[in-house]
């Protein structure tokens, strides 16, 4: 019986070495160690052994069972590791394959121009002020020297929500709100960028567009200060050789008022299609803050003065990039936008 046990052990170990799958290993376990396995069947005949043989055969049987179980456990671990390596090899990512291409985004040309304008004025010591786009009639018109019966209100087609609430037509209300908050402190030196709304829609107008307005209030502010600031802005925005000129104009909230032109950067002032032969391009409106506006905001116009200016960001972008139709900026056509 001892020899039969050792022979079965050798057969079982040889079978385990050739097994390649967990299923094959389980079949070997059942064949030799199962309830009806060969080792189990052989051990059932131990009752026929003599008292002297039984302990010795029992010890050999335990050794055989233990050796088969240990070999089975070790082989099972190796088979699982081999299967894992095979699976990893089959699922390995080929790092040489090209990945999916994602287009790189970029800032919208209006955002680029807006940030450039802000950067220039911040370099001149201005701070950024913001306010609500849904505004009161008082701040949008009345506090800017535009009472309800003023004919200049016709210059701006307005989106009214109700008789006293509207979508702001310019960012000037931010200036009034800032003055009310700061009074009687000076100086005030702010720019007010943001969206504004008017009932216009054609090649050069949009019902929603962007403005940057500026305000300076302090003692002894003069028109020369206004001219110096805007000339510096024009040179930094359009080139150091850019010239500026101021033409008399009218705005209810400034007195005196002026339109600001720059020398055409396309023809250097000689006349071309861009400037319509004049050599000049209009870029913004400006003027000294009207005494009534200062007074309504809480300042004494006898003690402080100020200047204000305002420009359309779309207008600046169209001039800077040679865009002839405002609507191109809002069509979201990547073929157009990717040029900037």
Swiss-Prot record:
GO-annotated molecular function: ATP binding; catalytic activity, acting on a protein; magnesium ion binding; phenylalanine-tRNA ligase activity; transferase activity; tRNA binding
Subcellular location: Cytoplasm
Positions contributing to Mg(2+) binding: 255
Gene Ontology cellular component terms for the protein in this record: cytoplasm
Catalysed reactions listed for this entry: tRNA(Phe) + L-phenylalanine + ATP = L-phenylalanyl-tRNA(Phe) + AMP + diphosphate + H(+)
E.C. no: 6.1.1.20
Keyword annotations: Aminoacyl-tRNA synthetase, ATP-binding, Cytoplasm, Ligase, Magnesium, Metal-binding, Nucleotide-binding, Protein biosynthesis
Domain of life: Bacteria
Gene3D superfamilies: Bira Bifunctional Protein, Domain 2
Keyword Nucleotide-binding: yes
Signal peptide per UniProt: none
Family: Belongs to the class-II aminoacyl-tRNA synthetase family. Phe-tRNA synthetase alpha subunit type 1 subfamily.
Protein name from the UniProt record: Phenylalanine--tRNA ligase alpha subunit
Gene name for this UniProt entry: pheS
């Amino acid at each position: 019986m001892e020899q039969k046990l050792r022979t079965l052990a050798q057969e079982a170990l040889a079978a385990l070495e050739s097994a390649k799958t967990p299923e094959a290993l389980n079949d070997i376990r059942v064949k030799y160690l199962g309830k009806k396995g060969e080792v189990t069947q052989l051990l059932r005949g131990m009752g026929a052994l003599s008292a002297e043989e039984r302990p010795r055969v029992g010890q050999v049987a335990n050794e055989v069972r233990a050796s088969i179980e240990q070999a089975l456990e070790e082989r099972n671990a190796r088979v699982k590791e081999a299967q894992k390596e095979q699976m990893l090899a089959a699922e390995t990512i080929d790092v040489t394959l090209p990945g999916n291409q994602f287009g790189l985004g970029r800032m919208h040309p209006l955002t680029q121009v807006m940030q450039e304008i802000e950067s220039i004025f911040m370099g001149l010591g201005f701070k950024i002020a913001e306010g609500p786009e849904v505004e009161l009639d008082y701040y949008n018109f009345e506090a800017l020297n535009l009472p309800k019966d003023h004919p200049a209100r016709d210059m701006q087609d307005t989106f009214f929500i109700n008789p006293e609430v509207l979508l702001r037509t310019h960012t000037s209300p931010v200036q009034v709100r800032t003055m009310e908050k700061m009074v009687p402190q000076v100086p005030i030196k702010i720019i007010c960028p943001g969206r504004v709304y008017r009932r216009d829609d054609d090649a050069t107008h949009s019902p929603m567009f962007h403005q940057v307005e500026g305000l300076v209030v302090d003692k002894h502010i003069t028109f020369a200060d206004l001219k110096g600031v805007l000339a510096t802005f024009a040179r930094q925005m359009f080139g150091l050789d850019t010239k500026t000129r101021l033409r008399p104009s009218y705005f209810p909230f400034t007195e005196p008022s002026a339109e600001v032109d720059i020398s055409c950067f396309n023809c250097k002032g000689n006349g071309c299609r861009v400037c319509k032969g004049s050599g000049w391009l209009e870029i913004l409106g400006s003027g000294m803050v009207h005494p009534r506006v200062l007074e309504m905001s809480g300042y004494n116009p006898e003690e402080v003065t100020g200047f204000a200016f305002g420009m359309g960001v779309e207008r600046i972008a169209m001039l800077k990039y040679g865009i002839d139709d405002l609507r191109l900026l809002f069509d979201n056509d990547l073929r157009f936008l990717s040029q900037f």
